[in-house]
């Protein structure tokens, strides 16, 4: 009997090792005594995941909170950070960071370390971060990082693939980037390239959202062609994806805020048009995540269940203020207003 149990334990351990070997970070959340709890938690260099079991939030709200941290304060050239998150049925999880994700300059690898897979046509390494996430029935995942901050000459790529179990699954996903080290004039929007792509599917791989951005500096040294020139006084680009029944209040708040802000003229928001300069404050673009799905639901008399909010801001505090206000209704789901858990105003 003991021999059989030992073999089972060994096989189980091998499965865990195989699973964790594919990722720098792994989170699994399932119900334990009716409480959302981390039943699998793993991280390795360059990522560390913190799971505070005692949080000073509303204890009547069931939510598991996680914080990701980069060793050394940021990601260096060629770092690959694959992460897996599985939020199972009826659970709630929030994944945050403890500061901006700093991405340092891309460098040429030594010939001994040149594998051919992580080196591009310019013979420099790209830093890459990936996420594979699953959200179960009636579950909610809130992905609430601080923004990426790419240093001069950095190359950064993000790929997020999120699978929702069905229409009862809910998601709040924030993806954003700042201009970089704005205290240095030559480091503003001075990274080489930034690519981010988020794909959200439901059930039978029906695509809900494909949200992507690509920012690149021109190969020439012509200042007029530089990314900094093209971005004008924009300092932050952000996108927020809200899907599912548990984000309904936040979706309504986003729509109301954008509608109200379109009437403001100073230190606030206006609708962004292709040729207009960015005003002081914030500009918005608001859309449903799936036009075909929305049209079908409207014919049935039901409410839209998805929203994508895109934000341009002239400073990072304005962007934080927008996120705090628009996502504040999620407090009832996760126990604390997003981006306010560290005492933000």
Where are these regions (language model features)?
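Conserved beta-strand/loop scaffold segments within soluble protein domains that form the structured core
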Residues: 15-256
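A structural signal for small-residue-enriched, beta-sheet-centric alpha/beta enzyme cores
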Residues: 175-345
């Amino acid at each position: 009997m003991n021999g059989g149990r030992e073999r089972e334990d060994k096989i189980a351990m091998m499965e865990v090792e195989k699973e964790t070997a594919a990722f720098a970070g792994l989170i699994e959340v399932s119900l334990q005594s009716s409480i959302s709890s981390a039943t699998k938690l793993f991280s390795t260099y360059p990522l560390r995941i913190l799971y505070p079991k005692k949080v000073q939030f509303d204890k009547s709200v069931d939510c598991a909170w996680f914080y990701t941290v980069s060793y050394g304060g940021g990601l260096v050239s060629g770092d690959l950070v694959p992460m897996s998150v599985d939020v199972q049925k009826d659970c709630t999880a929030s994944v945050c960071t403890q500061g901006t994700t700093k991405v340092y300059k891309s460098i040429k690898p030594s010939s001994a370390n040149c594998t051919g897979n992580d080196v591009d046509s310019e013979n420099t390494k790209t830093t890459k971060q990936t996420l594979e996430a699953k959200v179960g029935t009636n579950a909610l995942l809130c992905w609430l990082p601080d923004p990426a901050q790419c240093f001069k000459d950095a190359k950064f790529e993000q790929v997020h693939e999120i699978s929702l179990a069905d229409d009862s699954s809910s998601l709040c996903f924030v993806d954003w980037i700042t201009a970089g080290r704005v205290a240095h004039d030559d480091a503003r929007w001075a990274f080489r390239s930034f690519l981010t792509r988020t794909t959200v599917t439901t059930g039978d791989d029906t695509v809900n959202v494909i949200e992507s951005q690509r920012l690149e500096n021109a190969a020439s040294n012509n200042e007029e062609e530089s990314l900094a020139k093209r971005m004008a006084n924009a300092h932050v680009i952000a996108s927020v994806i809200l899907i599912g029944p548990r984000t309904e209040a936040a979706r309504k708040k986003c729509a109301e805020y954008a509608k109200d802000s379109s009437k403001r003229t100073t230190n606030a928001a206006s609708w962004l048009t292709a040729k207009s300069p960015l005003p002081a404050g914030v500009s918005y673009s608001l859309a449903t995540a799936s036009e075909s799905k929305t049209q079908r639901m409207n014919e049935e008399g039901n409410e839209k269940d998805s929203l994508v909010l895109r934000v341009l801001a002239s400073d990072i505090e304005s962007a934080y203020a927008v996120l705090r206000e628009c996502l504040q209704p999620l407090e009832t789901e996760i126990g604390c207003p997003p981006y306010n858990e560290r005492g933000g105003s």
